[in-house]
């Protein structure tokens, strides 16, 4: 299966991207069958705004994101389009990916392994409980994603606080049904020039993160949670009340974390109380986030 159209939004690149795309389409004999739209940015818009521009320029009912220089496996589109034909309620579908180096040599791992995705998380998404999973963390990578264009009615405009793929997943999980395919359907390159890369964190990485300065990251997370709450509120009846109430709880939890005192000893009673209420487990990474709040330097 081939795409009906390709939208290229070139964010002020210097590697001849547009010419390469046009040359490839012509060489493969697809110039008469695939509609090509080329957008050029100068100055650059940045990752999220550039994707928003490209997505808005599409015309087809299903949109497959393709960023950086990742490689789709043969049959990837057909595999991902099929569930949309079978399920009218499906808004977004994503998959695993094989991690490769810049020469496409497999690195012996997958995206889900690097992200430490739990089987229980995948089962919950497949069972229709994706919003509960995304209250804790995002599992969707844009390069593995296909979604209905109709999702844009609720998702646009993308807020500045969010990355495009995380936002699309959050809105899809809040307003309808999303799903996940556990098989890797693309090769996801890892190299120095990646805009966004991934690797499984080591124990040392986690310790460094736990004791790192708090900085403004919790304020940023609060801003993200508030932006999503604002959008869900605006969407009204399209969002189940249970999701809205859950997001209110997420905002309260993120505000709690953002307002913790600089003195680590002073945090202990309130952090333990928040943990006993189950909010770290529901809205964050459980004991890992508890340890972070107890150990982070103010």
Regions found by a protein language model. Give the residues of each.
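Nucleotide-sugar donor-binding/catalytic module of glycosyltransferases
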Residues: 1-201
């Amino acid at each position: 299966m081939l795409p009906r159209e390709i939208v290229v939004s070139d964010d002020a690149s210097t590697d001849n991207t547009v010419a390469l795309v046009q040359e490839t389409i012509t060489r493969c004999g697809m110039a008469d069958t695939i509609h090509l739209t080329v957008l050029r940015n100068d100055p650059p818009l940045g990752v999220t705004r550039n994707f928003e521009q490209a997505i808005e320029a599409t015309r087809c009912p299903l949109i497959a994101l393709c960023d950086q220089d990742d490689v789709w496996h043969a049959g990837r589109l057909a595999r991902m389009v099929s569930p949309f034909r079978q399920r009218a309620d499906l808004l977004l579908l994503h998959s695993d990916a094989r991690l490769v180096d810049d020469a496409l040599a497999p690195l012996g791992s997958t995206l889900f392994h690097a992200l430490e995705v739990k089987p229980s998380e995948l089962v919950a998404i497949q069972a229709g409980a994706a919003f509960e999973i995304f209250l804790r963390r995002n599992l969707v990578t844009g390069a593995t994603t296909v979604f209905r264009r109709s999702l844009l009615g609720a998702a646009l405009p993308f807020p500045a606080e969010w990355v495009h793929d995380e936002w699309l997943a959050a809105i899809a999980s809040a307003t309808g049904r999303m799903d996940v395919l556990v098989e890797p359907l693309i090769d996801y390159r890892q190299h120095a020039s990646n805009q966004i890369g991934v690797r499984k964190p080591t124990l040392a990485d986690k310790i460094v993160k736990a004791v790192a300065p708090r900085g403004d990251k919790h304020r940023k997370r609060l801003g993200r949670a508030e932006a999503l709450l604002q959008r869900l509120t605006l969407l009204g009846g399209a969002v189940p009340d249970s999701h809205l109430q859950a997001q209110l709880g997420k905002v309260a939890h993120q505000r709690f974390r953002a307002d913790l005192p600089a003195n680590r000893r002073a945090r202990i009673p309130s952090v333990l109380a928040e943990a006993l209420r189950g909010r770290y487990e529901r809205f964050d990474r459980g004991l890992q986030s508890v340890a972070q709040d107890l150990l982070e330097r103010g």
